């Protein structure tokens, strides 16, 4: 790749990430896409999230039993899409109890403890995506 093409791609990626972060401040739900660990096919699913600073926190609804979480363990590439603006990042699985509890608290603050209890059944894993 020529230097000018590489520079343009980097600038486009930064612009897309900035646009994505702006949209993430306005929405309560996003779409993530991961590669199936067996099929290799792209799988997309709507999820709740918490944006804090340059980090996006995800909480699998069935903890470590959640299929998209298992896929991330096999291939950490994850596409984050907020209503038409999206890009691909690296997902970092979190299993440390204290760190997972911190993510759960962030979700309770954003969505309410009642809804987190209603929709989430296992609390042993989370995912962090560095957006910056």
Residue ranges and their predicted role:
Residues 2-38:
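Short, conserved active-site entrance elements at the starts or edges of catalytic domains
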């Amino acid at each position: 790749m020529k230097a000018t093409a590489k520079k343009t791609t980097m600038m486009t990626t930064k612009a897309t990430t900035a646009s994505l972060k702006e949209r993430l401040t306005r929405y309560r739900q996003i779409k993530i896409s991961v590669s199936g660990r067996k099929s290799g096919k792209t799988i997309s699913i709507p999820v709740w999230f918490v944006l804090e600073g340059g980090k996006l926190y995800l909480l699998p609804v069935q903890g470590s039993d959640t299929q998209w979480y298992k896929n991330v363990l096999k291939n950490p590439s994850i596409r984050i899409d907020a209503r038409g603006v999206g890009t691909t990042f690296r997902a970092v699985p979190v299993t440390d109890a204290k760190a997972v509890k911190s993510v759960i608290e962030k979700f309770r603050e954003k969505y309410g403890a009642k809804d987190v209890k209603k929709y989430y059944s296992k609390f042993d894993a989370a995912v962090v995506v560095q957006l910056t």
